[in-house]
Curated annotation (Swiss-Prot):
This is Large ribosomal subunit protein uL11. PROSITE patterns: RIBOSOMAL_L11. NCBIfam families: L11_bact (TIGR01632). InterPro entries: Ribosomal_uL11, Ribosomal_uL11_bac-typ, Ribosomal_uL11_C, Ribosomal_uL11_C_sf, Ribosomal_uL11_CS, Ribosomal_uL11_N, Ribosomal_uL11_N_sf. One of its GO terms (molecular function) is structural constituent of ribosome. GO terms for cellular component: cytosolic large ribosomal subunit. One or more lysine residues are methylated. SMART domains: RL11. Part of the ribosomal stalk of the 50S ribosomal subunit. Interacts with L10 and the large rRNA to form the base of the stalk. L10 forms an elongated spine to which L12 dimers bind in a sequential fashion forming a multimeric L10(L12)X complex. Belongs to the universal ribosomal protein uL11 family. It comes from Helicobacter hepaticus (strain ATCC 51449 / 3B1). GO terms for biological process: translation. Disulfide bonds: none annotated. Forms part of the ribosomal stalk which helps the ribosome interact with GTP-bound translation factors.
Length: 141
């Protein structure tokens, strides 16, 4: 029989920069998990992922051990990097803050494909395009 799961946490932590300060420390400390052990393991696994925030799902077991799964960076972070902007538009219908080509859309969709709820690359591109439009980014063919 496997270990008994007592909790699951979802956090977004900068790649390679996990430390015991909030939000990591308090979230893990409440569940009596070894914070430094998690930080070292997370930083080692994400050191080559650039400066993105990385979504992580931490499964905590009854014996206070843990496992974690890292996901790909959020679509909005990938879009901001591709469009070379720091934040989306405050009014996406009126103010356009950047442009993306369909090739860039496809690259983002390929990167994020395993995390998206899409059956093929075309559906993934539509999801990414919708996120880009809601940020005030124009899509060019």
């Amino acid at each position: 029989m496997g270990k008994k799961v007592v909790g699951e946490l979802k956090l977004q932590i900068p790649a390679g920069k996990a430390n015991p300060s909030p939000p990591v420390g308090p979230a893990l400390g409440q569940r009596s998990v070894n914070i430094m052990e998690f930080c070292k393991a997370f930083n080692e696994r994400t050191k080559d992922m650039g400066d993105f925030n990385i979504p992580v799902i931490i499964t905590i077991y009854q014996d206070k051990s843990f496992t974690f799964i890292t996901k790909k960076p959020p679509v909005t972070d990938l879009i901001k990097k591709a469009a070379k902007i720091t934040k989306g538009s405050d009014n996406p219908l009126k103010n356009k803050v950047g442009k993306l080509t369909s090739k860039q859309l496809e690259e983002i969709a390929q990167t994020k494909m395993e995390d998206l709820n899409a059956s093929d690359i075309e559906a993934a591109k539509k999801i990414v395009a919708g996120s880009a439009r809601s940020m005030g980014i124009e899509i060019q063919d």
